[in-house]
């Protein structure tokens, strides 16, 4: 349980950091790429919360991992179209790698209580 709480805390912190950055995107990118990034963040958060309480935890975690990869590309695109500074992209990439590792560790950890009772 400690792992899932840490990942939720870390992901929330990353989400807050990212939203503060997408708010600074120029108008055209804020209402296209910025919104897409924010929606992806909310989707991943929802999947992590569902994994925390679901019997099908790994299904939600695998899906969250895929969404995290899409988010990596969106963040990279933000850097490439020059709406996110290289330094900020570096921080985002490290944060996403850490979150991805935590998801992987959660997948490999012992089954959820619901799964153990089956």
Where in this protein do the model-derived segments appear?
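Amphipathic alpha-helical assembly/interaction segments
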Residues: 1-118
